[in-house]
Structure formats: structure tokens, C-alpha cells
Amino acid sequence: MSWRGRSTYYWPRPRRYVQPPEMIGPMRPEQFSDEVEPATPEEGEPATQRQDPAAAQEGEDEGASAGQGPKPEAHSQEQGHPQTGCECEDGPDGQEMDPPNPEEVKTPEEGEKQSQC
């Protein structure tokens, strides 16, 4: 009796060595002064400011909804993911979340029914 199936053992692949980046010198805050203090544009150049896209969108929303009454509270929740009270849905990135800790999971009693998603 000889077994001619394929082996399930795979040899480990050789690791590729990646050289670390060269250290030129100590990191100093002076090297990153443009991130801390933005440079002021000259008089001939238009002023461009780096803003957070969400902050820019809020500014646009305020101007558009100024005469439309109170604002809906869409900013209190995640946009596109309304809270339903169900904790077994995918995360905001569409990836599955880790399973809950079995010690923290409570089993429903006989009279109660657990909500299904």
C-alpha cells in the first residue's frame, strides 16, 4: 500500500532581507517647520489653505441650509451607517469585526428573544 497523494507540508520560503533606511541624523522639529507653520503666500499668488475635507463640507452646508430651518443631526452619527442598535453588523470599512469575548457574551433567558440582523 503506497500513498501517492500530495504532501501537505510546504517548505518555508526564503525570507527576503530588506535594508532599513539610512539614518542621516537626529530628527529635528526645524526640518518639519512647514507642517507646523504654513508658509504665507506672496502677494501675486492666490492664497490656498489646507483644510480638512469634512471641515470644508461643513462650511458649505452652513451656507446652503441657512434659510432652511434647523439642521438634521447627521453629524452625531456616522454618515452612511445609521445606528440600528444591532451590534453584529460589519465595521465601517466593510470588514468583519472580531468575534466578541465569550466571557462577556450573555445568553438570552428563556422568555427573551435576541434580535437578529
From Swiss-Prot:
Lineage top rank: taxon: Eukaryota
Membrane-spanning segments: none
Organism: Homo sapiens (Human)
InterPro entries reported for this sequence: GAGE, GAGE_fam
Annotated family: Belongs to the GAGE family.
Phylogenetic lineage: Eukaryota, Metazoa, Chordata, Craniata, Vertebrata
Biased composition (Basic and acidic residues): 103-117
Protein name: G antigen 12F
Binding partners and assembly: Forms tetramers.
Pfam family, one: GAGE
UniProt region (Disordered), positions on chain: 1-117
Further comment found in the protein's record: This gene belongs to a multigene family expressed in a large variety of tumors whereas in normal tissues, expression is restricted to germ cells. These genes organized in clustered repeats, have a high degree of predicted sequence identity, but differ by scattered single nucleotide substitution. Their sequences contain either the antigenic peptide YYWPRPRRY or YRPRPRRY which is recognized by cytotoxic T-cells.
Ranges of Acidic residues composition bias in the record: 32-45, 87-96
